[in-house]
From Swiss-Prot:
Keyword Transmembrane helix: yes
Localisation per UniProt entry: Host cell membrane; Parasitophorous vacuole membrane; Host cytoplasm; Cytoplasm
Transmembrane segments: 739-759
Keyword presence, Transmembrane: yes
Disruption outcome: Conditional knockdown reduces parasite growth and proliferation. Late-ring stage parasites have irregular shape and trophozoites exhibit an abnormal stunted phenotype rather than progressing to mature trophozoites. Parasites that transition to schizonts harbor significantly lower numbers of merozoites per schizont. Delayed parasite maturation. No obvious differences in general schizont morphology or in the ability of the erythrocyte to burst. Merozoite clumping after egress. Reduced capacity of merozoites to invade an erythrocyte.
Protein name: High molecular weight rhoptry protein 2
Subunit-structure text: Component of the RhopH complex. RhopH complex is composed of CLAG3.1/CLAG3.2, RhopH2 and RhopH3 with a 1:1:1 subunit stoichiometry. Interacts with CLAG3.1/CLAG3.2.
Disulfide-linked positions: 46-71, 233-240, 791-851, 871-912, 947-1034
Job of this protein: Participates in the formation of new permeability pathways in Plasmodium-infected erythrocytes enabling the uptake of nutrients from the blood plasma. Required for maintaining invasion capacity of merozoites. Required for parasite growth and proliferation.
Lineage, broadest ranks: Eukaryota, Sar, Alveolata, Apicomplexa, Aconoidasida
Length: 1378
C-alpha cells in the first residue's frame, strides 16, 4: 500500500517556480502612469503582457496584432471593474490566465534580472489594478501584501500544473502522520493527551485487586447517586448511562417490594406483612437452606446452614452441609461439613414449603397477583396477562425480585454456563432476557411515559410528536459561536443540563441506607469494570453528542423526522415495527455501544482536521475567483481558504481510520480494564454495515419479502428502530442507552445500502467503464441520469434540518455533514487508496462521491457551469449541448477521476481566456486539415475531445472493413492500415471511405499531401509547425493498451462468440508491431560524453531475462512432472511454483552482473539508452559499506519496452511505469535536437530554447532524511524544514551512476539487514542550499555540477525482484514472437 505524506505536497508548492521571482522591488508607483481609461496605458499594458509571455514560437505577427487589438478593450473593462467586489473575479482570473499561459507556452527566462524595465507578474498586477482599491483596502498596499497576492497566484498555478498526482494514493491523515510539522504537532499531542488523560477519572474511584475491579476505600461510604456531576460520567457516557439504568431499576423495584407488606395487611388474612418480611428475610441463619454462586453463576447444589464462623482474617464464613435431595430433607442426619464464604451464599426460599399451608400459600399468591394488577391497571392488556399468571409464576417473581434487591444482581437459573457479569447486571434488556416479565410490566405501567402494551402503543406514538419548530425558535438555542467554524452553536450549559436532568429524576427523594450504598457501589463497579482508554468521550465528542441529542428531542433533527416515521406506519403494522426494533436492540446492544464509542473517536479526528485548517499550509483565496467551489466541503473552506488538500482529500484521509501506520487490528471493546491507547480505529462503515445486515435480516424475517429487492420499500422498520435508538425508547423490553452517534451512522448506511448502492440489485451497473477506458460511444446517458437522481436523494437525505425557510448553517449540522461525507467516502472505498485514484472503485461510486461533495451537483454539471461562466467556448467551436460530452470524454481519459478533471477544466478556462485574445476561432467538431496547427495549441481538453471523435471514426472504419472481409479475410495488415491512415490523417474525414482508398493506393503520396496541406496553411515557419505537429498525439495511437481498447470496442459491436474472441486475441498479440517504431520518450536529459565508456548496468535487465529464462525451464519441468507416473498431479503446481522462485533467485545470484546486463557504447551511439527520472528508491537495500546510496538507474530500449508493457510496480516509477517516468539519454557532444523537451541542468547547450526546458524534482524516502545533516558546499546545517520548503538541491553527478550491482551475497541468503542510518560512513547523498548554488564547481566531473531540487516522499513499494508478475510472463510471449 502506498502512503504519500504531506511532504510530497509541500514540495509541490515550492515558491521558486518558473523564474517568477517575488523579491523584485516595486519600481512602479502604485497607480502611477496607468490611469484608468487611458488608451495609451491600455496599449502599453497589452504590450507588456506580450513581453511577459514571450510566446514568439506560438504567436505569428498576425496573432500578436489580434491580441493587442482585443486586449485593449478587455483591459479597459477589467480596470473599470477591478474595484467592484462582485466583478473582481474577472481581473484575478485574467491575471491567472496570463501566468498560466506563460507556464504552458512562454519563455520563462527572457528577462534580465534586476532591470528596471522588467515586466513581471507583479508589475502587471499593479498596472492592471491601477489606482482603484477594493472595499476595505488601504490606499497603498504594502510590498508584503502585494507579494503575498502574487504568491497565491503562483501557488495556485503550480497546483494546476502539477502532475505528481499520477502517482497519488490517499494521504495518511494529514495531522496524525505529520510528526515533523511544527505547526501541527501540538494539536496532535493535545488530542492524545486528552484521550489518555481521561483514564485518571477511573483511577480516582477504582483499583484492581486479584483480577477484580474494586471501589477505593475512600469511597466505601459514598452512595454515588450524584456521580453524574463528576467528569468520569461525561467521559464515559455509555457506562454512566448503564449505571443509572441499574440505579433507577433498583430504586423503583425496591419501592414496589416495600409496598407489599402494607397491601398484605389489608388484603391477606393468612399472611400478614410482618410474616411476609420474615418469610423473605435473606439474612443467613441456622437451619436456612442456601444456594451458592460463583462469578454470578448460581450452582445447582443446595446447602444446609449449620453455623456462622469467623476465620483469622475476620472474614465471614458459613459452616454448611450439602443437601443431596431437597424433597427428602433430614436436618438431623449427619453430613460432612464445609466452610464457605458468606459473600458467595444466598438464602434459597421455597415459599410453599416455608408456609407449609396450602391455603395460606394460595391466599398469599392471590394477594400478590392482586397487588401487581393494582400497579398495572393503566393498561388492560397487561393487567389481563398478569391475571393469567399461575401461583408458581407469581412465586418466581417474588423470589427473583427479593434475590435482586438483596444481592444486587439478577437471579438466572437457565443456561447458566452461558452467562457472565454483563448478563446479570440490572438493565431492562437483561430483565427481559432473564424472563422477569412481571417486573417489566410493573416498571412500564408505573414509571414509563408509554404505559400501553405494544398492541396499543400506536395510540401513544400518535400523541407523542415533536412540536413544529420555526427557525426563530431554533435561533434562541444557538446562542454561541464555534471557534473553528464560526457557526452558531448550542449553549453548552443548556444541553448538558438537559441531559443530566434525567439522572436527577432517577435519584431525587431517595435516601439510601448502608445496604443500598453497597448495591449502588456494585452497580457502579459493574458498569465501569470494562472501562478502557479507547472508549472514552473527550470534550469535543461529548459536546457534539449532547447537541445532537438535544436537537433531536427539541427539534426532531435527524435524517428522517420522527413525525414522518410515525406517519408512515399503519396502525395494523405497528406491532411488527415494535417487534423488529425490539429484536434488533436486544441482539445488538453491545455492537451498537462499540460503534458509538468508535464514532466518538472519529469526531475527534474531524475536529482536529478543522484545527489543521487554520495552519499556514494553505492556498489563500481571499482573492475572489470561481475555482474549486465545493458546495459540500468543510464550511471553513468555503470562506477564503483552500487547503493544499481539498475537503474531499481531507475526508478521504480521515476515512482510512488510522492514527498511525499500524495494520494490526486491536479489539477495543470488552477487553477488560485496559489503559493502553491503540493507535488505530476500526472502519466505522464496516461496523455499521454488519449492523445493517442484522437489521435487514430482521426486516426480511418479519415482512417475508426478498431482502435485497424490497428492502427500501420497508425502510420504515429501520427508521422506527433508529428512532428508538437515538430517542427515548418507549419499548421497555429493549430500553437502554441512547445511541446518538450509532444512529446517525447506521441510518446513513441503511439508506446508502438500500437506496443508493445499486450494485445490491444489479452488480454490473455502472461498472461499464471498468475494463474499457476511455469511452468511445455515448451509450451511458441514461445511467448517468440515474446517478444524478440517486445523488440528489442522498444529499437531501443527509440534511438533518430540512426546514425549507431561509436558515443559516449551524455547527451541529456542519459536523454531521462532515461525518456523513466521511461515511459516503467509506462506502466507496475499496482499500486505503483514494477513491478517486483507485482502479478497483467502480465509476458509479467515484462519481457519486464527487456529486455528494458538490452538494448534489455532478462533476459534469459543476464544470460545465464554471466553464461557461468564465470562458467563451465558441472559441473552439463547442456548443453548450456538447460541453458535458467533452467533460465526460476527458473524465474517461483520466479514469473518471473528479480531482484530475477539475484541475484540467480550470486549466482549460485559463487557456481559453488568453487564446480568445490571441487566435482566430477553430471548430473542433469539424476541424479541417488546414486548421490542424490550431489543435496543437488548444487546451488539453479540446485535444482529447477531438481525439475521441477521431477514435470513434477509426472504430467505425475498422468495423466496416471486418464485415466487408467477412472476418476470415481480415488480416493484421488491415489493422495496421487503419492505424496508419488515422495517424497520418490526424483530423476527421467527411469522405472517410474515399480518402481511405486513396491512402491505400499510395500511402507515401497521401502522407505527403496531408503534411503539405498543414504546412502551407500554418502562419508559422515549417520548423515551428513541425514542432507543433510532433508535440501532440491522439490518445488512441500512443500505446498498445489504448489502441487495443479501440479494437475491443469494435469487437463488442460486432457480436460475441468463441471464433470472434480467438480472432481478436490473435490480432492483439500481433498489434504490438505497430508500436515498436512509435515508442518515443519525449523528455531528454543531457549527460557528458564519457558516460558511454563507464560500463553502466542495465538495471532491470536481469529481472526481464530471468522471467524468460525461468519460463523455459518451468515448461520443461512441467512436462517432466506431468509425464512422470510417480508424481502426484495435485502437487505439480506447487512444485513448479517453488522451482520458479528458486530459478529466479539462482539467476539473480549467478547472472545479475553478466555482460548482457551491461550498457554498451553502441547503445549510446544508437540513442537507445534511457534513465529513470528518480534514483534508486530502496536505499535501505544498499549495504552500509557501499558509498553509493544515491544511484541513477539506466536501461536499454529493450528493457524499457518490457517495463512499459507490464504493470509491475517499480519503486522508481512509484507504481507501474509510463513514458513520463523516463528521460532519453543524450550525449552533450551529439547532434543538438533543440526542439525536444529538455530536463534543465548545467549540461544543456545554450542553443536550447529555455521554453523547451522541463524542471525535474528528485524524491527520496523520508526515512533517509536523517542522513542529511549539512550543506556539501558550506557545511552549514540543513534541517528537515528546509527540504519541506523546497529550498534544497541534491547532487546527481557521476558518482551516482550505477556501475556495480547493489545486491550482495547477504541479499541472496536473506541475512541483509536494511540500512536506514548511514550518517557515520562516507556516502554520496550530497545536498546544498539553493542560495549557495553559485558556489557549485564548474568542473563537469564534480558531484554537484549536475543537481536537481530535492523533495521527500513516503512510498511503500516492495522490490520488484521479489515478485512474480503474471502480466510480464504473458507479455513475454507476445514480445518473444517479434
Amino acid at each position: 500500500m502506498i502512503k504519500v505524506t504531506i511532504f510530497l505536497l509541500l514540495s509541490i508548492f515550492s515558491f521558486n517556480l518558473y523564474g517568477l521571482e517575488l523579491n523584485e522591488k516595486v519600481s512602479i508607483k502604485y497607480g502611477a502612469e496607468q490611469g484608468v481609461g487611458s488608451a495609451d496605458s491600455n496599449t502599453k499594458l497589452c504590450s507588456d503582457i506580450l513581453k511577459y509571455l514571450y510566446m514568439d514560437e506560438y504567436l505569428s505577427e498576425g496573432d500578436k496584432a489580434t491580441f493587442e487589438k482585443k486586449c485593449h478593450n478587455v483591459i479597459g473593462n477589467i480596470r473599470n471593474t477591478f474595484s467592484n467586489k462582485n466583478t473582481i473575479k474577472e481581473g484575478n482570473e485574467f491575471l491567472m490566465s496570463i501566468l498560466h499561459m506563460k507556464s504552458l507556452y512562454g519563455n520563462n527566462n527572457n528577462n534580465n534580472a534586476g532591470s528596471e524595465s522588467d515586466v513581471t507578474l507583479k508589475s502587471l498586477y499593479l498596472s492592471l489594478k491601477g489606482s482603484q482599491n477594493t472595499e476595505g483596502e488601504s490606499e497603498v498596499p504594502s510590498d508584503d501584501e502585494i507579494n503575498k497576492t502574487i504568491m497565491n497566484f503562483v501557488k495556485f498555478n503550480k497546483y494546476l500544473l502539477d502532475n505528481s498526482n499520477d502517482i497519488k494514493k490517499v494521504h495518511d491523515f494529514l495531522v496524525l502522520t505529520s510528526q515533523s510539522n511544527e505547526n501541527l504537532l501540538p494539536n496532535k499531542e493535545k488530542l492524545f493527551e486528552q484521550i489518555v488523560d481521561q483514564i485518571k477519572y477511573f483511577d480516582e474511584y477504582f483499583f484492581a485487586s486479584g483480577g477484580k475491579i474494586k471501589v477505593k476505600k475512600g469511597y466505601l461510604k459514598y452512595n454515588f447517586l450524584d456521580i453524574y456531576k463528576q467528569p468520569v460520567c461525561s467521559a464515559y457516557l455509555h457506562l454512566c448511562s448503564r449505571y443509572y439504568e441499574s440505579v433507577s431499576i433498583y430504586i423503583r423495584l425496591k419501592k414496589v417490594f416495600n409496598g407489599i407488606p402494607a397491601f398484605l395487611d389489608k388484603n391477606c388474612r393468612k399472611v400478614k406483612g410482618e410474616e411476609f418480611k420474615k418469610l423473605m428475610d435473606m439474612e443467613l441463619k441456622h437451619n436456612h437452606i442456601v444456594e451458592r454462586f460463583d462469578k454470578y453463576i448460581i450452582s445447582d447444589d443446595l446447602y444446609y446452614v449449620n453455623m456462622k464462623v469467623f476465620d483469622l482474617k475476620n472474614v465471614d464464613k458459613i459452616q454448611v452441609s450439602k443437601i443431596d435431595d431437597i424433597n427428602n430433607l433430614n436436618i438431623y442426619e449427619h453430613k460432612e461439613t464445609m466452610h464457605l464464604s458468606a459473600k458467595n451464599l444466598s438464602r434459597y426460599i421455597d415459599i410453599k414449603k416455608e408456609l407449609n399451608d396450602e391455603k395460606a400459600y394460595k391466599q398469599l399468591m392471590s394477594a400478590i397477583r392482586k397487588y401487581v394488577t393494582t400497579l398495572t391497571k393503566a393498561d388492560s392488556d397487561i393487567t389481563y396477562f398478569v391475571k393469567q399468571l399461575d401461583d408458581e409464576e407469581i412465586e418466581r417473581f417474588l423470589i427473583d425480585l427479593n434475590f435482586f434487591l438483596y444481592n444486587g444482581f439478577l437471579r438466572i437459573t437457565e443456561d447458566k454456563h452461558l452467562i457472565n457479569a454483563d448478563d446479570v447486571s440490572p438493565s431492562y434488556i437483561n430483565l427481559y432476557r432473564s424472563n422477569n416479565i412481571v417486573a417489566l410490566y410493573i416498571l412500564k405501567t408505573q414509571y414509563e411515559e408509554n404505559k400501553l402494551s405494544e398492541y396499543r402503543a400506536h395510540k401513544f406514538y400518535r400523541r407523542k410528536r415533536v412540536s413544529n419548530i420555526t427557525n426563530d425558535m431554533i435561533k434562541k438555542d444557538f446562542t454561541q459561536t464555534n471557534a473553528l467554524t464560526n457557526l452558531p452553536n448550542l449553549d453548552n450549559k443548556k444541553t448538558t443540563e438537559y441531559y443530566l436532568k434525567e439522572y436527577e429524576n432517577f435519584v431525587e427523594n431517595f435516601q439510601p441506607d448502608l445496604h443500598d450504598i453497597m448495591k449502588l457501589q456494585l452497580f457502579f463497579t459493574m458498569a465501569f469494570k470494562d472501562c478502557n482508554v479507547n472508549q472514552n468521550f473527550t470534550e469535543t465528542s461529548k459536546k457534539l453528542w449532547f447537541d445532537l441529542l438535544y436537537a433531536y428531542d427539541k427539534f426532531g433533527w435527524f435524517y428522517i423526522h420522527p413525525n414522518e416515521v410515525i406517519n408512515s406506519i399503519n396502525k395494523t403494522d405497528f406491532v411488527r415495527h415494535v417487534l423488529v426494533s425490539r429484536n434488533f436492540l436486544l441482539k445488538n446492544n453491545d455492537q451498537l455501544t462499540f460503534l458509538e464509542t468508535q464514532v466518538a473517536k472519529i469526531v475527534e479526528i474531524i475536529n482536529l482536521s478543522l484545527e489543521v485548517d487554520k495552519s499556514p499550509d494553505s492556498l489563500d483565496f481571499s482573492i475572489p475567483m470561481n475555482f474549486f467551489n465545493h458546495k459540500n466541503g468543510y464550511h471553513v473552506m468555503n470562506d477564503d481558504k483552500l487547503k493544499l488538500l481539498t475537503s474531499y482529500e481531507y475526508i478521504d484521509s480521515i476515512a482510512n481510520n488510522y492514527f498511525f501506520l499500524s495494520e494490526y487490528k486491536n479489539d477495543v471493546f470488552r477487553t477488560g480494564n485496559n489503559f493502553k491507547l491503540y493507535f488505530n480505529l476500526p472502519n466505522i462503515y464496516s461496523l455499521a454495515y454488519q449492523l445493517f445486515n442484522e437489521l435487514a435480516i430482521n426486516i426480511n424475517v418479519i415482512t417475508n419479502v426478498p431482502l435485497k429487492k424490497y428492502l427500501k420499500y420497508n425502510a420504515s422498520y429501520a427508521y422506527f428502530t433508529l428512532m428508538n435508538m437515538i430517542g427515548k425508547n418507549h419499548d421497555i423490553y429493549s430500553k437502554g442507552s441512547r445511541f446518538v452517534y450509532a444512529s446517525y451512522i447506521l441510518g446513513l448506511v441503511f439508506f446508502i445500502e438500500s437506496h443508493i448502492d445499486i450494485a445490491r440489485l444489479k452488480p454490473k451497473d455502472f461498472f461499464f467503464m471498468k475494463q474499457s477506458l476511455p469511452i468511445i460511444d455515448h451509450v451511458y446517458h441514461k445511467d448517468l441520469k440515474t446517478l444524478k437522481k440517486n445523488c440528489t436523494l442522498l444529499t437531501d437525505f443527509m440534511k438533518i434540518n430540512k426546514n425549507s425557510q431561509n436558515y443559516s448553517l449551524t455547527h451541529t449540522e456542519e459536523m454531521i455533514k462532515i461525518l456523513g461525507l466521511l461515511t459516503v467516502t467509506l462506502w466507496a472505498k475499496e482499500g486505503k487508496k483514494s477513491v478517486y485514484y483507485d482502479d478497483d472503485v467502480s465509476l458509479y461510486r467515484k462519481l457519486m462521491v464527487s456529486c455528494v461533495f458538490n452538494g448534489g451537483e455532478t462533476i459534469q454539471e459543476k464544470l460545465a457551469n464554471n466553464i461557461e461562466k468564465s470562458c467563451d467556448i465558441s472559441q473552439y467551436g463547442i456548443k453548450s449541448k456538447n460541453l458535458k460530452d467533452m467533460i465526460d470524454i476527458n473524465l474517461s481519459i483520466h479514469k473518471w477521476n473528479p480531482a484530475e478533471i477539475e484541475k484540467l477544466a480550470y486549466s482549460f478556462v485559463l487557456s481559453c481566456k488568453m487564446q480568445k485574445l490571441m487566435y482566430k476561432p477553430m471548430n473542433v467538431e469539424k476541424l479541417p486539415l488546414e486548421d490542424y496547427y490550431k489543435l496543437s495549441l488548444a487546451p488539453d481538453m479540446v485535444k482529447t475531445y477531438h481525439c475521441y471523435k477521431l477514435g470513434k471514426q477509426a472504430a467505425e472504419l475498422l468495423e466496416s472493413i471486418i464485415l466487408k472481409k467477412k472476418f476470415v479475410r481480415f488480416r493484421v495488415t488491415d489493422a495496421i492500415d487503419v492505424y496508419d491512415f488515422f495517424y497520418i490523417k490526424k483530423v476527421l474525414s467527411s469522405r472517410i471511405k474515399k480518402e481511405y482508398n486513396e491512402f491505400l493506393q499510395d500511402k507515401r503520396a497521401f502522407e505527403k499531401k496531408e503534411l503539405e496541406t498543414i504546412l502551407n496553411n500554418s502562419p508559422f515557419s515549417e520548423e515551428q509547425t513541425m514542432k507543433l505537429i510532433n508535440s501532440y498525439e491522439c490518445h488512441w495511437f500512443t500505446s498498445y493498451e489504448n489502441f487495443r481498447i479501440l479494437w475491443m470496442h469494435a469487437s463488442s459491436n460486432l457480436g460475441t462468440g468463441t471464433y470472434l474472441k480467438n480472432f481478436f486475441s490473435e490480432l492483439w498479440q500481433n498489434i504490438r508491431f505497430l508500436f515498436k517504431s512509435k515508442l518515443k520518450i519525449r523528455d531528454m536529459e543531457y549527460f557528458s560524453g564519457d558516460i558511454s565508456q563507464m560500463n553502466l548496468l542495465d538495471y532491470y535487465s536481469p529481472m526481464v531475462h530471468s522471467e524468460s529464462h525461468c519460463q523455459e525451464k518451468m515448461q520443461v519441468l512441467f512436462i517432466t512432472l506431468r509425464d512422470s507416473k510417480e508424481e502426484n498431479r495435485s502437487e505439480i503446481a506447487q512444485k513448479v511454483k517453488s522451482a520458479y522462485y528458486q530459478c529466479k533467485l539462482d539467476y539473480y545470484k549467478n547472472h545479475h552482473s553478466d555482460f548482457i546486463h551491461r550498457i554498451h557504447p553502441n547503445d549510446f551511439l544508437n540513442n537507445k539508452v534511457y534513465v529513470l527520472k528518480q534514483p534508486y528508491y530502496l536505499m535501505s537495500n544498499v549495504p552500509l559499506n557501499n558509498p553509493k546510496k544515491v544511484s541513477r538507474l539506466f536501461v536499454t530500449e529493450g528493457t524499457l519496452e518490457y517495463l512499459l508493457l507490464d504493470k509491475i510496480n517499480i519503486p522508481e516509477c512509484f507504481g507501474p511505469c509510463t513514458k513520463l517516468h523516463f528521460n532519453k539519454v543524450v550525449i552533450k557532444e551529439s547532434k543538438q535536437r533543440i526542439y525536444d523537451m529538455t530536463i534543465n541542468n548545467a549540461l544543456v547547450p545554450e542553443i536550447q530554447p529555455y521554453n523547451r526546458r522541463k524542471y525535474m524534482t528528485i524524491y527520496i524516502n523520508e526515512a533517509y532524511i536523517k542522513n542529511i545533516v549539512s550543506d556539501a558546499l558550506t557545511s552549514e546545517e540543513i534541517k528537515r524544514h528546509d527540504i519541506q520548503k523546497g529550498n534544497i538541491k541534491i547532487c546527481m553527478g557521476k558518482s551516482t551512476y550505477l556501475t556495480e550491482p547493489i545486491l550482495t551475497e547477504e541479499h541472496f541468503n536473506l541475512t541483509h539487514k536494511p540500512v536506514y542510518d548511514f550518517s557515520s560512513v562516507k556516502h554520496n547523498l550530497k545536498v546544498f542550499h539553493m542560495k549557495n548554488e553559485h558556489l557549485v564547481s564548474e568542473d563537469p566531473n564534480d558531484d554537484c555540477f549536475i543537481n536537481y531540487p530535492l523533495a521527500t516522499i513516503n512510498l511503500d513499494i516492495s522490490d520488484p525482484y521479489k515478485e512474480i508478475s503474471e502480466d510480464l510472463i504473458k507479455n513475454l510471449y507476445i514480445l518473444k514472437s517479434s
